[in-house]
């Protein structure tokens, strides 16, 4: 089943109590309504490359928090040797809900809410799209300057306390984060930078190859078919997103955005709860491959 924000946060507390030597609580920022953006750090040894997992920045995309909590649970409890290896050779920062106000609002008021909940002066419409609010090619492509739209980018870059505080937290880990994974739904896509231009990144070919391998791994279990590509070409131009900012500003070489199940459908944000576990399983399969392939290509060599 899908869980509320208090349920997710109390589960994180429980993990800290149950695994005190490997799990520590982390606050990644705060929200307009004063909630914490809470996550955990999972670490089994010193000096590991860091994998940053950001999820549910769009409030209605509930499968993302469900999938990242599934991943977190696997890292701590799985007996599978491949997953143990992945858990213990990387440091994981996992933030299941990076838009807590919006997430709560989707449970109490409007299941289809996407944005933050901050008021917009001069408008009756509330909220900014937090994945169009980051200070990297802000307001250039696939975003709107009208507050009543779903993709409103905000009155300025980092106008939202959520994106501002979370980006400040990420900056404290600059140089340590080697992999950035952002989770969205839906469309079954695995996307990499950039969203503001069709120009390829310096490691475009690697990101395409790693992504293709990850999509093959993901498909093995249930035949779920993912398309891989840079945002601009694979989905649509969209600038001001967290992944592009993290990739560019923090020099994180391996950066992907997942668009989880389903592929399409009129109610794609309301994925039936009986698909949570399968989505989690196949997604973990693909994350294993992203890390394995990135390592094989030399991205985690400590000498750089």
Curated annotation (Swiss-Prot):
| SMART domains linked to this entry | Zn_pept
Name its co-factor(s): Zn(2+)
Record-annotated Peptidase M14 domain positions: 1-294
Enzyme Commission code: 3.4.17.-
- What tissues is it present in? Gut specific.
Which superkingdom?
A: Eukaryota
Query: Which cysteines are cross-linked by disulfides?
Result: 125-148
- Key word Secreted present in the record? yes
Its GO CC terms?
A: extracellular space
Q: Which InterPro entries match?
A: Peptidase_M14
Q: Is the keyword Mitochondrion assigned to this protein?
A: no
Relate the induction remark in this record. By blood meal.
Residue sites binding Zn(2+) per the record: 58, 61, 184
Active site, UniProt feature: 259
List the Gene Ontology MF annotations in alphabetical order. Answer: metallocarboxypeptidase activity; zinc ion binding
Q: Where in the cell is it found?
A: Secreted
Q: How is the cofactor bound?
A: Binds 1 zinc ion per subunit.
* GO BP: any one term: proteolysis
Q: Which UniProt keywords apply?
A: Carboxypeptidase, Disulfide bond, Hydrolase, Metal-binding, Metalloprotease, Protease, Secreted, Zinc
The similarity comment for this entry is: Belongs to the peptidase M14 family.
| Role noted for this protein | Involved in the digestion of the blood meal.
This one is known as Zinc carboxypeptidase
